[in-house]
């Protein structure tokens, strides 16, 4: 599908506006402050992870390599959505051009898909570390880690580009359509098309299965082997700590994949239109906030590196 047709499918330009969360001014201010606080926490938490991994040689292992890239994805992922969302909460609705909507959709889908593939890669990394500890450094080489990360981005990039191009070659009715969402996501934009969208829905389901179902199954298989390995640990304290870590990781995975599946894989209905934007808040704010907390900030190595970095920074400022 030629990308050049992305914006020129109409004889006249079309723009979209996002439906407001609420028209009550006091609630607008409250929502703005809440989402701004969550966004700043996401920025601080994920930036801290990237900084500490890049500045401490002891954390330059495959696990922390993937964690830092996950944090970078979360930063980009939320930044594509949240600033525009915040600007629309307060004041009058601001229209977004067809090209701007297409760009936001492309980056949102690409980064979100890469995130899903990366979570599967991280589960495989943990499987190798726990089930094959003696061969971990031989298997998880720097070259393999880089190739897997590039593969995740490539697998996300191609279908995202094709899906976005396919959607924005559709005709849209009128020149000032309202999107029943806080971002240019695929399902709400598809509903605005003035054409038969059954083929586009089928493509969306195929892409969703590729991005959501397959990585989730790989994660489940990895954790089945990890669980079997944990059960063989003789120390009760060791088993408890391992299960505690795995349960937190699986909580984030189930939350992200479950919410995304509800939006992209369930049949379309009139009730799902309003529910989609509410569910999307979970994987826009909650999982990007939980990932640095549960994957890294609970880790003793990361906390120790952060503590030593802060002490060194304070000492250098004092001198």
Swiss-Prot record:
Cited function: Odorant receptor.
Cytoplasmic topology ranges: 51-58, 125-143, 223-242, 298-319
Gene3D superfamilies according to UniProt: Rhodopsin 7-helix transmembrane proteins (1.20.1070.10)
For this UniProt record, give its keywords in alphabetical order, as a comma-separated list.
Answer: Cell membrane, Disulfide bond, G-protein coupled receptor, Glycoprotein, Membrane, Olfaction, Receptor, Sensory transduction, Transducer, Transmembrane, Transmembrane helix
In the bilayer, the protein is annotated as:
Multi-pass membrane protein
**Does Ribosomal protein appear among the keywords?**
no
Q: What is its main location?
A: membrane
The UniProt transmembrane annotation reads 30-50, 59-79, 104-124, 144-164, 203-222, 243-263, 277-297
Q: Which GO terms describe its molecular function?
A: G protein-coupled receptor activity; odorant binding; olfactory receptor activity
The keyword Zinc belongs to this UniProt entry's keyword annotation: no
| Source organism of this protein record | Homo sapiens (Human)
One GO cellular component this record assigns the protein to is:
plasma membrane
State the gene name recorded for this protein. OR10Q1
Q: Which PROSITE patterns match?
A: G_PROTEIN_RECEP_F1_1, G_PROTEIN_RECEP_F1_2
Disulfide partners: 101-194
What is the protein name stated in its UniProt record?
Answer: Olfactory receptor 10Q1
Q: Which segments does the topology annotation call Extracellular?
A: 1-29, 80-103, 165-202, 264-276
Where located?
Cell membrane
Residues modified by glycosylation: 9
